[in-house]
């Protein structure tokens, strides 16, 4: 009984580890797409986009959606501050 319980707990740890790796990979891909799509062309807007991506990188797991929203909002604000040709592309 003890051997079976320890084996099943090892299997649970492996599956949790795999799901964490997947969420961090998808977070990185969303984060990189935010930096490509949302950016400014002058002033402080690149800094604003960088702050949004840093927030997206800190929030892992459920923060994937939150980081995407923050990056998009910051890109739009940076575009409004910089001019009509800047923002999310």
Swiss-Prot record:
GO BP of this protein: sorocarp development
Pfam families: Coiled
InterPro entries: HssA/B-related
Superkingdom: Eukaryota
Protein family per UniProt: Belongs to the hssA/B family.
Cited PANTHER family: HSSA/B-LIKE PROTEIN 17-RELATED, HSSA_B-LIKE PROTEIN 17-RELATED
UniProt name for this protein: HssA/B-like protein 15
Organism placement in taxonomy: Eukaryota, Amoebozoa, Evosea, Eumycetozoa, Dictyostelia
